[in-house]
Amino acid sequence: MKKRIRTIWAGVLCLCPVLALQAGWGDLQEQLRRMVADKKVGIAVIVDGSDTLTVNNDVRYPMMSVFKFHQALAVADVCGQRGVSFDTLVHIRPDDLRPDTYSPLRDKYPEGNLSLSVGELLKYTLHLSDNNACDILFRVFGGPAATDEYLRSMGLRDFAIEATEDDMHRNLADCYRNWTTPLEAVRLLEWLVSGKAAKGAYRDFIEQTMISCQTGRDRLPAPLAGTKAVIGHKTGTGDRNGKG
């Protein structure tokens, strides 16, 4: 029987004032270390684009579907360079809609042979974590290698994106080919907020889609429910075999 493993990242997209830290960075870091002692958890915090704090940042964490956020930024870059909007249509073929994976897109359009906009596909990937929509975007926008190359051109280093959703479904070991450190993941969130990665309407679309994300509401956003914090996040959940 397959077990489930979760890889979770979440960031506060700074649309509300950052709460003043009651303790110094060193004290906060020590508190966080104690909280996650003996657990496979990595933490990274960036405040005002410069002050950083990390815990267990020297591990390559498998991203699972978290890389769909990275993909969205690469898609935005290509659209920006081409001067086209997220309204650009993409034809969806029947063989794009694999039956053996999580895909609300396939459930809604089981026959394929239709066109949806890039923005609609991004809503499926970021909002619902649709695996087929992700691989359709890879087909159109250059595959994992293009996303990896774009992020490296921006200065990201401690990460890799090499596998599609179909690759990971066929071979669980391929899940480890898409990895990141906590700091690089949070740095990418900070770049989105600041406009360094994705600009204008592209940035606004991705940010708002992540804020309205429907997956993982019972995970990291849960403790902040009812507060003034505005949470934008992308979770990832994958399978593991009996050996872990």
PLM regions and their residue ranges:
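Bacterial Sec-dependent N-terminal signal peptides
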Residues: M1-D27
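Beta-lactamase-like hydrolase cores
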Residues: L21-S65
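Mid-domain, small-residue-enriched loop/turn segments at the edges of structured enzyme/sensor domains
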Residues: K40, D135-S194
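Active-site SXXK
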Residues: P62-V90
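Active-site-proximal alpha-helical segments within enzyme catalytic domains
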Residues: F69-H70, Y176-I211, G244
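Acidic helix-start/capping segments at beta-turn-to-alpha-helix junctions
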Residues: F86-L105, F141-G142, T209
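Conserved catalytic neighborhood of penicillin-recognizing serine enzymes
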Residues: L97-I136
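Short, Gly/Ser/Thr-enriched beta-strand-loop segments that form substrate-interacting elements
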Residues: D218-G244
